[in-house]
A protein has these predicted regions:
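C-terminal motif of bacterial Sec signal peptides marking the signal peptidase cleavage site
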Residues: 19-23
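Hydrophobic alpha-helical segments within soluble ligand-binding/sensing domains
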Residues: 122-164, 263-284
């Protein structure tokens, strides 16, 4: 009887130890496989991806993480194909760079952790009513939303005599629509006439921009991936017509704007990477992680300001001569 009890006890102990070791192995893998789906190539998204990768390398070590970077070339259907391949390969985490990439990943898996970045409003992007800052489930990330009320204030600060503001944006991007609604509300409260000028894709940007520039004192371009991919087209038109653009983010401002209140997308991506490291190493559960933000700062494009004869206040920093154009 004693021998039987000892055998059972020994077996139980061995089983417990085996499970314990198995748990340790799963919680700290030799190499983490991370899939990155980026909507399109442009300065802001590129910087976010760079920051994300660097943060994971800094936190886990270069030999501990393997990246599979895929670019969807501004095709939402390609986003779905890319993230489904990540799911089939059973990657440890998916980083979705921009709203269509996040939406595709959200629809592709409910088990693999998904972190979004360069996403403006998660509630709008994922159709969550009463969004409280936490997506829950297997999704979290970072937002590139700058204070929209302060962006509206920037327009009136720089151009106090402006009576007509045109808002130029892509109608196919839900986050752009959200920003347009908010900024329009803030500007109308200042008794400014606001008109919307929307394009469905890059093919009609030139004609819509020309119309906007012909009927506006100032143009506002929100954080918008399609606009960010074609700032040269916008810039050539507005400079020729001498109509200033206030941009929702830095890459658009570098290409065609005079000023912006914008976040740094490298910092945004880096914060996303820090979140990824905490998830992969088991330090945090993604279902409890709130959407994170980074601080915005006032910046101006000296090159375009000089061309238009615009002087900005001293609290704006010069973003330099780097230009991200089509």
């Amino acid at each position: 009887m004693k021998k039987a009890v000892l055998k059972v006890a020994s077996f139980a102990l061995c089983l417990a130890l085996a499970l314990s070791f198995a748990g340790c192995k799963d919680s700290k893998k030799d190499v983490y496989n991370v899939g990155i789906c980026q909507l399109v190539t442009h300065g802001a998204l590129d910087k976010a991806t760079d920051g994300f990768k660097q943060a994971l390398i800094d936190k886990l070590g270069k030999d501990k993480v393997k990246f599979d970077y895929q670019n969807a070339a501004n095709d939402s259907n390609a986003c779905a194909t890319i993230v489904n391949s990540f799911v089939q390969k059973k990657y440890d985490l998916i980083m979705a760079n921009a709203t269509p990439a996040l939406q595709a990943a959200y629809n592709a898996t409910s088990t693999i952790p998904i972190l979004g970045t360069s996403v403006t409003e998660y509630g709008v992007a994922l159709g969550i009513d009463g969004f409280d800052g936490t997506v829950g489930g297997n999704v979290s990330g970072t937002s590139d939303l700058a204070p929209l009320d302060k962006q509206a204030d920037m327009i009136t600060e720089l151009f106090p005599n402006a009576k007509k503001v045109g808002i130029l944006y892509c109608s196919a991007e839900p986050n752009s629509k959200y920003q347009v609604e908010q900024v329009e509300k803030f500007l109308k409260a200042k008794n400014i006439e606001v008109s919307r000028y929307s394009f469905s894709d890059s093919n009609d940007i030139a004609s819509v921009t020309t119309t906007a520039a012909s009927n506006s004192d100032v143009i506002y371009v929100p954080t918008d991936n399609t606009a960010a991919s074609c700032t040269e087209t916008i810039g050539n038109i507005v400079v020729e017509k001498k109509v200033p653009v206030v941009a929702g983010e830095a890459s658009i401002c570098r290409g065609c704007g005079v000023a912006t209140l914008s976040i740094d997308y490298y910092d945004l991506g880096y914060k996303t990477g820090e979140m990824a490291a905490e998830i992969l190493t088991g330090k945090k559960d993604i279902k409890n992680m709130k959407i994170e933000y980074v601080d915005a700062k006032k910046q101006y494009n000296k090159t375009i300001c000089d061309k238009l004869g615009i002087t900005v206040p001293s609290d704006y920093s010069d973003m330099g001569e780097e230009s991200w154009n089509c």
